[in-house]
Amino acid sequence: MKNMTVIVNCFDYTAIAQKAHRINKLPSIVCYERPADFPKKFVARLFYLGNETITTNVVVTGDTYEELLEKINPVLDYLGMVRFNRAPGDDNCIMEVWL
C-alpha cells in the first residue's frame, strides 16, 4: 500500500534533526509551486539525502509562497538550511531546494 501524504502545519524540526542524525542523512526540503497533486497550493516536501534518497510523505502547504515560507522558516533556521535555486533539469514546478 502506498503511503498517504500527511499534511502538517509545520515541520517538527527536532524530530527531523534527530532522525537525520540517527540515519546519517542530510535533511532536505523541496518547495514546489502548484505541483500536480496540489494544483492550487505551494508545497514543501521533506526528503533525507545520502547514498540513497529517502522520500517522506510529510508536506507543508500554503496558499502563497510567503505563507509557505512562514510555516517552514522555523525548521530552516533551526537546522541552518541554505537555499538553492532549482537546477535546469528539475521539474518546472520546483521552486527551490533547502539543504
Predicted features along the sequence, with ranges:
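A short, charged, amphipathic alpha-helix used as a generic interaction element across diverse proteins
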Residues: N57-R83
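Short N-terminal "domain-start" leader segments
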Residues: K2-K41, N73-M81
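Cysteine-rich, disulfide-bonded extracellular modules and peptides in secreted proteins
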Residues: A17, L49-T53, N92-M95, L99
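N-terminal, helix-rich and Lys/Arg-enriched segments in bacterial and organellar proteins
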Residues: H21, P27, K41-L46, V60-Y65, ...
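Short aromatic-glycine-(Arg/Gly/Cys) micro-motifs in beta-strand/loop hairpins
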Residues: P35-I54
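Short, mixed-charge low-complexity intrinsically disordered segments
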Residues: L79-L99
